[in-house]
Amino acid sequence: AIELNQIWDFPIKEFHPFPRALMGVGAHDIIGVEAKNLGFKRTLLMTTGLRGSGIIEELVGKIEYQGVEVVLYDKVESNPKDYNVMEAAALYQKEKCDSIISIGGGSSHDAAKGARVVIAHDGRNINEFEGFAKSTNKENPPHIAVSTTAGTGSETSWAYVITDTSDMNNPHKWVGFDEATIVTLAIDDPLLYYTCPQHFTAYCGFDVLAHGSEPFVSRLDFAPSLGNAIYSVELVAKNLREAVFEPRNLKAREGMMNAQYIAGQAFNSGGLGIVHSISHAVSAFFDSHHGLNNAIALPRVWEYNLPSRYERYAQLAGALGVDTRNLTTVQAADAAVEAAIRLAKDVGIPDNFGQVRTDSYAKNQMNTKKYEGRGDVIKGDEKTVRAISEHIQDDWCTPGNPREVTVESMIPVVDHAINKSYF
């Protein structure tokens, strides 16, 4: 298990760089020019199930118009798997590509980051690169990341997340932190978010909320991250409902775009916590959507963490729109939890994991066999609750959590997230 005190043992914190980014309405129009200017000749385009939305076809046209050849890998799955990464890296080598473009959300971007690492290390298995700065060869292929969701912020961070499926009796979703995977160019255009379905907009929005709130209360307490962190929470509170229910509301979509990006910058150096640890564990076992997992875990984790960070959660309440002027610090912190629950209810988040059907996710669309035996619902039996709690203990996000975490302390939190209700 990761020692929770290791952060205290290393009080010198590290500020990680951000990539160059093009942000705003119409930014996607110049992807071809940017690819050409970066020297792309034959690029591997990695994406999920976006074919047919019109986005891939439009962007491929803009890229090819500038004389850049495109090789398509469109088999990236939600919660990208180790075999997605290895297949893409092999295709890159077979087709003699010189660059990568990822289009989509965090799954596309993270799979592309993983493929870059594998390519730079002569085809070594991606699962060898879990943890901090495992790359020995930093000369990765150049990478343009184009976002079509406001969620992960992967296009601005040094982190990537991969699911190790080598032992399906003990599936493992791991995090890699490596500056070698920072993208060459990020493109965020709110026009590309218009086709994101309502429920995915909500799920991804809660991913942003987790990315903003966790570094704000993190044990690292990294000052350069705090401003971006809390402002991203404010942007989510102001824009997520409108983005969900008015998908072509440009102001709301742009607000969520900005929230995603600065939340990504916040956790890039400020760290995360057990909202993400729970999410990774549930995804590993059931392949459920990462943002949805965060949404269900978030209020439970906030309640668990409150005693260690009352003042910070009180500030989050203000960012979420709560009038805290006549509240004590503890009352305001409690109100933050209530505001998060209300936001989840408003945008259609299921009340617990037991209400989640996993048969609507990419694993079924891609005909993946790995998760067939898992069923279509998340079951909260004692064995599963303990297995998830043990996975949390070993997650790379857990050391940043403000309150100490043990397997036993997580069991009631996980049990509540699967079997109990807020609404």
UniProtKB/Swiss-Prot annotation:
Its EC number is 1.1.99.37. It catalyses: methanol + A = formaldehyde + AH2. Its cofactor is Mg(2+); Zn(2+); NADPH. Keywords: Magnesium, Methanol utilization, NADP, Oxidoreductase, Zinc. GO terms for molecular function: alcohol dehydrogenase (NAD+) activity; magnesium ion binding; NADPH binding; oxidoreductase activity; zinc ion binding. It comes from the Bacteria. Signal peptide: none annotated. Gene3D superfamilies: 3.40.50.1970, Dehydroquinate synthase-like - alpha domain (1.20.1090.10). PANTHER family: ALCOHOL DEHYDROGENASE, ALCOHOL DEHYDROGENASE 4. Belongs to the iron-containing alcohol dehydrogenase family. Catalyzes the oxidation of methanol to yield formaldehyde. While the in vivo electron acceptor is not known, N,N-dimethyl-4-nitrosoaniline (NDMA) can serve this function in vitro and is reduced to 4-(hydroxylamino)-N,N-dimethylaniline. This is Methanol:N,N-dimethyl-4-nitrosoaniline oxidoreductase. It comes from Rhodococcus erythropolis (Arthrobacter picolinophilus). The gene is thcE.
